[in-house]
């Protein structure tokens, strides 16, 4: 048998096997059903921030100023968080201020939700940690059974809760009240914020 024929007999099965392997991956692709969860009221920005094993979602609804609708880094005018449970949206409320939001927050399998909320108290240092331009104190929160309560900080005025697991452990950051000396002059959000876990 010639070398060319042996090479052909070797290559054809390998090429066929690779082609069939690629084809089977294409056929086995998962298909998805996409559902529009909608926005609330006059809000123009809506985002599902988290999904638990029950199919419940944490939904953020926010507004951006005119002309900044396509700029996700823009100043937020307003924000609310909702728990979407089987298609019914429940407003999680606030801690006394106007706005609530989350950092890719979390809803665990028990329906506990974390995020951050403005209080009615102006920040004594003029910080705007919640990012709504109100300069109100921004506190991390835990919502259980649709009842929101503030989580403590590390001695500072502000913080944010980012995620919660099924053991009820919460992570985020909290200020310790100390001035961050590395901030340049004129920076308003100038306090030290440390990673935190609430257990």
Which residues make up each language-model segment?
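Residue-level hotspots at or immediately adjacent to binding/recognition sites across diverse folds
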Residues: 2-199
């Amino acid at each position: 048998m010639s070398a060319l024929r042996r090479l052909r007999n070797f290559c054809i099965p390998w090429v066929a096997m690779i082609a069939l392997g690629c084809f089977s991956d294409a056929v086995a692709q998962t298909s998805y059903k996409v559902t529009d969860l909608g926005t609330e009221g006059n809000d123009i920005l809506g985002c599902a921030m988290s999904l638990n094993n029950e199919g419940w979602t944490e939904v953020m609804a926010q507004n951006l100023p005119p002309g900044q609708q396509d700029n996700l880094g823009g100043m937020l005018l307003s924000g609310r968080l909702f728990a979407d449970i089987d298609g019914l949206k429940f407003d999680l409320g606030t801690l006394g201020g106007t706005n609530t939001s989350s950092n890719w927050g979390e809803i665990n399998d028990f329906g506990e939700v974390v995020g951050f909320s403005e209080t009615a108290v102006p920040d004594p240092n003029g910080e705007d940690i919640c990012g709504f331009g109100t300069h109100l104190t921004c506190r991390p929160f835990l919502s259980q059974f649709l009842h929101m309560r503030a989580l403590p900080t590390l001695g500072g005025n502000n913080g944010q809760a980012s995620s919660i697991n099924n053991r009820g452990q919460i992570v985020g950051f909290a200020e310790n009240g100390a001035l961050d000396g590395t901030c340049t002059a004129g920076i308003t959000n100038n306090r030290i914020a440390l990673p935190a876990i609430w257990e």
